[in-house]
Amino acid sequence: MPEYQTNGVRFEDLEVGQEISTMHWFVTPDDIASAAEAFYDDYPLYFDKDFAKESEWGGIIAPFYFLDATFRWVVFLSRGRMRHQCHTINAQGILESFLPIRPGDRLVGKMWVHEKFQKRGKNFLVWRMEVRNEDGELVARKFWRSYWTDREIEFPKKETYE
């Protein structure tokens, strides 16, 4: 995996079944509230302890889209600085949720190359991402199909972000 951080991700180098990344994180009440706020979702189940306590869930849970936004790390890996050197377009995504996510959950996310194919001379890749809790239970899974164009991306220099 470290070679991706220096060389970038190239379609021809990826193999079906190959594990690309793993990430561990601890879910905080602020993470959940921030996700809801980012989506302009003011449903109190995501941030009001008293309201959530009276719900069928018995406490605060993350909104269904919480992990969809979180899944972006698996491709962009902002913490590991892994980058695509090729331009890709999101062609399809299927997100399956199996268990609620609560404040205090310790999650492990992993990503693999699930499928790789050509269609009409164009390259497509399907990533499989899974998130499990500290008990090893499957919390969510996403299949994310991306179309790989022939264009290269020129990344801006760090100083352009300042």
Task: Cite the ranges covered by each PLM segment.
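Short glycine/proline-centered loop/turn elements that form peptide/ligand docking sites
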Residues: 92-99
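HotDog/MaoC-like acyl-thioester-processing domains
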Residues: 1-15, 99-162
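Hot-dog-fold acyl-thioester-processing enzymes
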Residues: 1-92, 153-162
